[in-house]
Amino acid sequence: MSKVLIVEDDPLVSRMYQTVFQFEGFDVEMARNGEEGIEKLKSFKPIMILLDIMMPKMSGIDVLRIIKNNPDLKNIPVVVLTNLSGDKDVDTALDLGAVKYIVKSQNKPKEIVAQIKEILAGYTREEIPKAATKN
């Protein structure tokens, strides 16, 4: 099963995306803020991270920097999923290594899932990080 980490501070939005992704067959782990997202990555190795930008404790941009500067995490594709639609926000996220920038208010949840599946289909098995296994 494909593991996805969703880092989102809004509980209603978080629950909605968790439900939609689980319905589509994803194993979903949730984090309520950037710090929690980084902490969860110590034990949960997803094949993709969905990351909000505006969050308490640590912004999504700061989380993205940490992920892309960590040799163990930098190859995990990160999709920014936010309501910020300014060109500067988009450029910053993509320059830091996000593979896609999706504005939540401009896409239905099922459309977002379809975009995520399309992105994942573009990676070969060797490029997608393997999920953590129990030894």
State the predicted function of each range.
Residues 8:
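Conserved acidic carboxylate
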Residues 55-58:
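Receiver (REC) domain active-site loop signature in two-component systems and cognate sites
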